[in-house]
Amino acid sequence: MFEITYKGLFIFITLAWIATRAICGIKNKKVDWKYEAKLLTVYICLVVIARIVYFPMRLVEGHIASLVLDIEKIFPLWINLIPIVHLFDVYDGWLINIIGNVTMFIPVGLAWPFCFKKLDTLGKTVLVGAGFPLFIETTQLPFYDRCSDIDDIILNTTGIFIGALIYFGVKLLKNRKNRIS
């Protein structure tokens, strides 16, 4: 059995981020601090989403519960591949689950096209963005107390779509205003 704490995952994500940004700086032989500041929005999205997705909101003895990897309990995988079947099942917190899964990813839809020039259309942003929840759902598979659900991917991608729609809508309005002026 192996336990991953939020603090451990936070340190891992942070060190990986710093190493990646340092390698990019060395490769490019310069650091664009304005761009690095923009990229912090992506980093914040990663850290916050990792906290919400991998670590339950309930506290155990006053601390964030650990993520437990137990090889003997991996199978059977907890996975739902049939969309919408369980989405509207009424249980405590079902509405919060739906709203939370959408709103949690709106910042991704805003941050990614803001930071990455190649994500210059709504379609590209949503298509690339959909890979992020797919990655998250896949990485939850080995953890017996987590489940992977196609509905989460659909809801998360909807959040990315909403965020990108806001981003490109504001950008369009700004461009129109500049043309009129």
Model-derived segments and their meaning:
Residues 1-145, 150, 164-181:
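Bulky hydrophobic segments
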